[in-house]
């Protein structure tokens, strides 16, 4: 069982299923969790953030709160990054912290980028030597998650 789980979340609703999955993963052991959220900047030159620092910190604080309420030791981390560097930052921060496992969302993206493996989840899976667990989408039943978890 992992003792340090690095959980990467974004601002979309999928973060709730990622946090719930990480909570179940950590609940039965003395696992600690670090929740990571990157403030993504898009564009060229003077890139614009997709959200404010306050919005990003609120996303992380909410996730940490839910983990702590479930009895899981948790802390959060927010870092600015360019959209194309998010996967590298996830892997680098997880390694820097000494994580055993990285948890990412399982939401299916759209378009050719997902099919060709250009999504953040796919790039984390390719880049990391750590165990990477993909949280199932919210519509998957809790019983199935427990069986496969």
Residue ranges and their predicted role:
Residues 28, 35-62, 142-149:
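Acidic, proline/glycine-rich short linear motifs
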Residues 1-49, 72-75:
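Small/aliphatic-rich secondary-structure junction motif
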Residues 1-17, 126-149:
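Intrinsically disordered or low-complexity boundary/linker segments at protein termini
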Residues 93-100:
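Glycine-rich phosphate-binding loop signature in dinucleotide/nucleotide-binding domains
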Residues 101-127, 137, 141-146:
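Glycine-rich, Arg-bearing micro-motifs that act as flexible, cationic patches
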Residues 79-89:
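Charged docking surfaces used in two-component/phosphorelay signaling
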């Amino acid at each position: 069982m992992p003792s340090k789980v690095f959980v990467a979340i974004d601002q979309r609703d999928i973060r709730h299923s990622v946090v719930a999955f990480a909570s179940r993963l950590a609940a039965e052991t003395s696992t600690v969790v670090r929740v990571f959220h990157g403030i993504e900047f898009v564009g060229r030159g003077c890139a614009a953030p997709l959200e404010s620092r306050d919005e990003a910190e609120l996303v992380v604080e909410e996730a940490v709160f839910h983990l702590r309420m479930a009895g899981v030791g948790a802390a959060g981390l927010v870092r600015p990054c360019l959209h194309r560097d998010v996967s590298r930052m996830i892997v680098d921060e997880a390694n820097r912290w000494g994580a055993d496992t990285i948890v990412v969302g399982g939401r299916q993206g759209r378009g050719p980028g997902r099919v060709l493996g250009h999504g953040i989840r796919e790039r984390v899976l390719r880049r990391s030597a750590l165990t990477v667990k993909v949280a199932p989408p919210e519509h998957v039943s809790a019983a199935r998650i427990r069986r496969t978890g």
